[in-house]
Amino acid sequence: AMSDSIKALSTEIPATTEEIAAVAEAAGQLGIQKDALLDFTEIMTMLGTATNMTADEAATSLARFANITGMATDNYGRLGSVIVDLGNNFATTESEIVAMGTRLASAGKLAGLTEPEIMALAAAMSSVGIEAEAGGTAMTQTLNAIEKAVAKGGDDLAEFARIAGMSSEEFSSAWKNDAMSALTSFIG
């Protein structure tokens, strides 16, 4: 049963049975499917141990992020590893990365960014002191404007391309094939 699995988990990771059960309960309330519940609970509990987020905060934030991006439940482990790695390598915290990432999720997905790319962009932005609310809004507007310009062509596309040091055709192709590198060229 689930309670046996939770007890077993408490011997593998530094969390009490009660803490793990609370995360499992939250996961159920967040709509995590039963077959993914134990893995999700383990990953979120480990994030609660390895980051500045509690396991509950990690569960709520990442479930919301996954819901916005349509991420498959079997990618939680990989995304958790990405967040810990970014937190270790940027001058920002995991909770700031996730807050910014959630703000960027919808526009990032629309632009064709992967979930790890969205979190990497979030880490880069929050590490230079950009706040999630204002920065997320500004970057969302930028991503949407680029997406619209690439779809329509014309002067707006030419301006984005000029700033990125490319022709309109090059920028349009880069955006469609690797939005993150096109964005990096534009920002850089």
Predicted regions and their residues:
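Short, intrinsically disordered, charge-balanced linker/junction segments flanking boundaries
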Residues: A1, L183-G188
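A short, structural motif
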Residues: A1-S81, G87-V98, A107-P116, V128-G136, ...
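Conserved catalytic-loop aspartate of Hanks-type protein kinases
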Residues: M139
